C-alpha cells in the first residue's frame, strides 16, 4: 500500500511540473467542475445542482457515502441528464474525506478536463456577484482563490436564494450555550483552485497544496 501511495504522489508531482508553463494563464472559457461528497442529502442535493449549473458549473463529480434516503436517485437523475459525469459509490464506514475529495479532483483533472475545481458540500451554495462563477474565474491569473463563507439565517416562506440575513458569528459560544458546529460559529474560508499544479486538498477543503501558488 505504501509503495502504491508513493507512486501516486510521485505521479502527481510529475504532472504538476508539466503543468507549470500554463499554470497562471487566463482562460477565457475555463472548464469548471464541482465535486460533491454527500450522504443522505435528498433535501438539498437537487437544489445544489440546479443552483450551481445556473452559476456556470459545467459538470459534477459526486461521491455518495452510503446514503439511505433518496440521494442516489437524484444523482442518477442528473447523471442521465449529463450533468453528473462521474459517480463514486463509497461504501467505507469511516470518514476519509480528504482522500475521497482528492480522488474526485484527480478524476476531474485527468478524465474530464477540468481547469478549475470547486469542492463543495450539499449545503454550500457558491455565489458570484456577476451571476457566473466561470466569468469570475476567466478574469484571474491566480490558481487558488480563498473565499469567505457566510451562514444565512433561514427565512420562512422564502426559497433559500431569497434569504437576505447573514449570520454574525458569536465570539463566545459557551456564554450562549451554542454548539461549536452551529451556524453561529465563525466559518473557515474555503478555496476554489485550478487543476494545473494540483498536489493535495486539505481536510474540509479549506486549503490546497499546489506546486506553485499565486493567490
PLM regions: where:
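Short, acidic, metal-binding catalytic loop of nucleotide-sugar glycosyltransferases
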Residues: 50-59
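Catalytic-site signature of metal-activated, phosphate-bearing donor transferases
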Residues: 2-15, 99-100, 128-215
Amino acid at each position: 500500500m505504501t509503495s502504491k501511495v508513493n507512486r501516486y504522489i510521485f505521479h502527481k508531482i510529475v504532472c504538476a511540473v508539466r503543468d507549470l508553463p500554463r499554470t497562471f494563464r487566463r482562460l477565457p472559457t475555463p472548464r469548471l467542475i464541482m465535486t460533491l461528497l454527500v450522504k443522505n442529502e435528498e433535501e438539498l442535493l437537487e437544489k445544489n445542482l440546479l443552483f450551481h449549473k445556473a452559476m456556470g458549473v459545467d459538470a459534477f463529480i459526486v461521491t455518495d457515502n452510503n446514503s439511505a434516503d433518496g440521494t442516489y436517485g437524484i444523482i442518477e437523475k442528473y447523471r442521465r441528464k449529463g450533468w453528473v459525469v462521474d459517480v463514486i459509490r463509497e461504501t467505507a464506514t469511516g470518514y476519509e474525506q480528504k482522500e475521497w475529495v482528492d480522488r474526485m479532483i484527480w478524476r476531474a483533472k485527468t478524465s474530464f478536463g477540468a481547469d478549475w475545481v470547486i469542492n463543495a458540500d450539499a449545503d454550500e451554495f457558491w455565489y458570484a456577484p456577476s451571476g457566473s462563477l466561470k466569468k469570475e474565474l476567466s478574469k484571474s491569473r491566480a490558481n487558488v482563490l480563498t473565499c469567505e463563507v457566510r451562514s444565512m439565517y433561514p427565512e420562512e416562506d422564502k426559497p433559500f436564494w431569497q434569504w437576505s440575513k447573514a449570520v454574525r458569528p458569536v465570539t463566545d459560544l459557551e456564554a450562549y450555550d451554542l454548539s461549536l458546529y452551529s451556524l453561529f460559529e465563525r466559518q473557515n474560508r474555503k478555496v476554489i483552485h485550478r487543476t494545473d499544479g494540483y498536489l493535495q486538498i486539505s481536510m474540509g477543503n479549506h486549503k490546497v497544496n499546489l506546486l506553485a501558488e499565486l493567490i
